[in-house]
Amino acid sequence: MAKSLRFIQCGDLHLGSPFHNLAAIDERWQRIVGKAPVRAFQKIVQMAIDKRVHAVLITGDVYTSADHNLTAQLDYVRLLHKLAQNNIQVFAVLGNHDPLEAWKAKIPFPPNVHIFPTESVERVPLVVDGEEVAAIYGQSYAKSEQRENLAWKFNRAAGDRFSIGMLHTQVGSRESTYAPCTLEDLKECGMDYWALGHIHKHEILCEKPYIVYAGNPQGLDCTETGPRGCYYVEVGPYGTTDLEFIDTSIVRWESIDLAIDGIESVSELRESVRFAKEKVRRDIGKPTFLTVNFTGSGSMYHVLNNPEATQYWLDSWREEEQGKYAFVMVERLRNLARPKMNLGERSKLPDSVGDYLNVFDKLEKLAPEEKVKALRDILMSRPEFERLGTYGRALTDERLLETFEKAKWLGVQKLLEHRRG
């Protein structure tokens, strides 16, 4: 390559996505945090200008739903115009949340924006100062479901200096409805760089060639913890490629584990949470919604199972954060701890608690796959299962095993309370 190339890869912007838990923060921060996805994209646009990139690649799911709201579209186009004013080209593919069939408002894009078609893979030259420095390939979704393996349709043209493939896809599964493909499918296409969308966690799947998920620029709920952002990429004159992940999140979602071992009073427990909050504030330095997972074993287990007490703590901790810039809002508490008890010895006693533990022990001795199957069979055989609806059908193996463990200890607690009563 005679010239170097600079670009930003981002995707899964989800502009207009509702941001939950805003009732817990004051009005000033509701206005700021409420538009966090848009503000995260604003940071990307400003970064593109500051770094004088040649292109911004957007790998699908600009919006959250098929009827993407008008305000989100206006915000998006306004920021695209800002890139146009700085001579930065934009290349975008449409994903499952913003397929071609879902585009309703006729808001024209500036001339610097190229949307890849849905019918076939298109090759578009990236020209800098009159010289083609790269070729960009892409294909968009026509509908929200795309069962075809689109990766098979990509082929590098002879003579490309540097080839970039853009695709909204789920790598690693041929059964997905999101343009499923494998890592080998992508490698065989001859691209020098793959800019992928759909997965919200940033990850480099391969370095030869680079196959990259940028993730989303802003976490949307408590499952999307950690830094969120985009990749800034520099390609040297001879094709050497350097990547830098840059955090663009306006607000963070975080999760911490807090062991209750050795904690013997409610005041100690509350102080431990307060100390953990301050550490998160120092480390992150921006508004944060925090999940606290209580682990270990101790006398505070029973207190943590009291919903009135935990709700009171949540309310008081939230009140402490009002008016703070880098607030750390404890969004939820999860009791993954255990009471102080030797289950092996307790199960030997000839009573209802011992019998209960022996039944659980038989399940726990199963291999993980067998245990999950047994638990699902038990769950699905119950008439109440249908009432769970989509939640029940979406229950992951991990969540099922976690619930099983929690149920064991809750059952022991209830049986012991009944015996004392």
Model-derived regions: residue spans:
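Accessory, non-catalytic peripheral segments of nucleic-acid enzymes
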Residues: 248-421
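Structural signal for conserved beta-strand scaffold positions within catalytic alpha/beta enzyme cores
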Residues: 9, 117, 138, 213, ...
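Short loop/turn motifs at secondary-structure junctions
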Residues: 4, 52, 132, 190, ...
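Domain-start "cap" segments at the beginnings of catalytic or binding domains
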Residues: 1-29, 228, 234-259
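His/Asp/Glu-rich metal-coordinating catalytic cores
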Residues: 20, 26, 55, 66-242
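Hydrophobic pocket-lining residues that define ligand/cofactor binding sites across diverse proteins
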Residues: 48, 83, 280
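N-terminal active-site segment of His-dependent metallophosphoesterases
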Residues: 1-73, 393, 397-398
